[in-house]
Amino acid sequence: MGKLTILFLVAAALLSTQVMVQGDGDQPADRDAVPRDDNPAGTIEKFMNLLRQVRCRWTPVCG
């Protein structure tokens, strides 16, 4: 029974080490990054993106 307990503890330690090494992909630089500007063309592009998101039915604008 003692050998089984030791084997279980070693397996748990190896798994936890593997999880710590692999991580979740969240790098410290990602947390502090400035959000990317999705609308570099300015206000009109923001408006057009909003119309596209709400499935604009105005043909001259949304095409």
Swiss-Prot record:
Domain of life: Eukaryota
Prosequence residues removed at maturation: 24-55
Pfam families, A to Z: Conotoxin (PF02950)
InterPro entries from the UniProt entry: Conotoxin
Keyword Disulfide bond: yes
Localization (cell): Secreted
Tissue note: Expressed by the venom duct.
GO molecular function: ion channel inhibitor activity; lipid binding; toxin activity
Key residue for activity, annotated site positions: 58
Record keywords: Amidation, D-amino acid, Disulfide bond, Lipid-binding, Neurotoxin, Secreted, Signal, Toxin
Family label: Belongs to the O2 superfamily. Contryphan family.
The protein's name in its UniProt record: Contryphan-Vc2
Protein's organism: Conus victoriae
